[in-house]
Amino acid sequence: MPELPEVETVRRGLESVVTDAKIVSVQLNRRDLRFPFPEAFSERLIGRKILELGRRAKYLLFHLSQDETILSHLGMSGSWRIENDLLRTAFSMTSKLVKHDHFIMDIQTRNGDVYHLIYNDVRRFGFMLLVDTDKLYKHPLLNKLGLEPMSHGFSGRYLQKAFVNKKVSLKGVLLDQSIVAGLGNIYVCEALWRSRLSPQRGAFTLASKTVYARELANSLAQNIRNVISEAILSGGSSLRDYMHVDGSLGYFQHAFSVYGREGKECLQCGTPIIRILQSGRSSFYCSQCQK
């Protein structure tokens, strides 16, 4: 599933084209994705402008004229891409993939160019909702989200407060979107390895008032920030279906230290990387370095 860096990369790729563009036509190739498309979705979009493209956690936010916002989630395999009559991505030439183009929105930019904004989703686990902009952050999908790793208030102190009395694992708490919004399995594994913390360690152990616990929490917060920042600069991680809006791939997966490296040597100490299951998800870590 695309995590914060992948969604932010998509946002940046779309932003320069879609901002202030007018929606001139909408084509729905099916009635639903994970959820049904909003009622009269096409009719409600045509003629509006996309004022701004935002993001909250793993959600893309197309802020429209007339005070509504398209809330888009990529699910497991969703992707957005941009094409026009002169530009065709390598992706668009593959008919096997194009058959999963479920939503096509033609937009006209400020200088009169027309682009096709296309949503493709093989597994159809993504979705789009139309929400009143003034009620957007009260929506159930957004109103309980925690701080994002790159936000001003995200710190070791914030994590320590969040970890108080948490008997569950560090991995489990960090994946809780009400605590850290946008963080997912890949980047939690990477940040924990950099912090020398086991994914199985109880989160509460970093919540004490000792200098040692405070240092661990500060290190973890900084490493989460670093991993997310580096992943964004690398265009995210392309493992299965994720790609950029031009059809190209992210390359942060080539910098993984632990994720997907089961049995390979730890880059720090040479001990084989272990894979375990936690709540049905794979965790990769070094039993020697991470305690």
UniProtKB/Swiss-Prot annotation:
Write down the SMART domains for this protein, in alphabetical order.
Fapy_DNA_glyco, H2TH
Q: What does this protein do?
A: Involved in base excision repair of DNA damaged by oxidation or by mutagenic agents. Acts as a DNA glycosylase that recognizes and removes damaged bases. Has a preference for oxidized purines, such as 7,8-dihydro-8-oxoguanine (8-oxoG). Has AP (apurinic/apyrimidinic) lyase activity and introduces nicks in the DNA strand. Cleaves the DNA backbone by beta-delta elimination to generate a single-strand break at the site of the removed base with both 3'- and 5'-phosphates.
Please name the HAMAP family in this protein's record. Fapy_DNA_glycosyl
Catalytic residues, per the record, are P2, E3, K58, R281
What are the names of the required cofactors?
A: Zn(2+)
Cite the EC number: 3.2.2.23, 4.2.99.18
- What's the catalysed reaction? Hydrolysis of DNA containing ring-opened 7-methylguanine residues, releasing 2,6-diamino-4-hydroxy-5-(N-methyl)formamidopyrimidine; 2'-deoxyribonucleotide-(2'-deoxyribose 5'-phosphate)-2'-deoxyribonucleotide-DNA = a 3'-end 2'-deoxyribonucleotide-(2,3-dehydro-2,3-deoxyribose 5'-phosphate)-DNA + a 5'-end 5'-phospho-2'-deoxyribonucleoside-DNA + H(+)
Name the chain's protein.
Answer: Formamidopyrimidine-DNA glycosylase
* Binding positions for DNA per the UniProt entry: H100, R123, K166
Query: Molecular function terms in GO for this entry?
Result: 8-oxo-7,8-dihydroguanine DNA N-glycosylase activity; class I DNA-(apurinic or apyrimidinic site) endonuclease activity; damaged DNA binding; zinc ion binding
Which family would the database say this protein is a member of? Belongs to the FPG family.
Which cysteines share a disulfide bond?
A: none
Assigned keywords, A-Z: DNA damage, DNA repair, DNA-binding, Glycosidase, Hydrolase, Lyase, Metal-binding, Multifunctional enzyme, Zinc, Zinc-finger
Note the superkingdom of the native organism.
Bacteria
The taxonomic lineage of its organism, from the top, reads: Bacteria, Pseudomonadati, Pseudomonadota, Alphaproteobacteria, Hyphomicrobiales
Q: How does it assemble?
A: Monomer.
- Annotated signal peptide: none
Question: InterPro entries, per this entry?
Answer: DNA_glyclase/AP_lyase_DNA-bd (IPR015886), DNA_glyclase_Znf_dom_DNA_BS (IPR015887), Formamido-pyr_DNA_Glyclase (IPR020629), FPG_cat (IPR012319), MutM-like_N-ter (IPR035937), Ribosomal_uS13-like_H2TH (IPR010979), Znf_DNA_glyclase/AP_lyase (IPR000214), Znf_FPG/IleRS (IPR010663)
Q: Which GO terms describe its biological process?
A: base-excision repair
User: Residue ranges of the FPG-type zinc fingers?
Assistant: 257-291
How is the cofactor bound here?
A: Binds 1 zinc ion per subunit.
Q: Is Repeat set as a keyword in this record? A: no
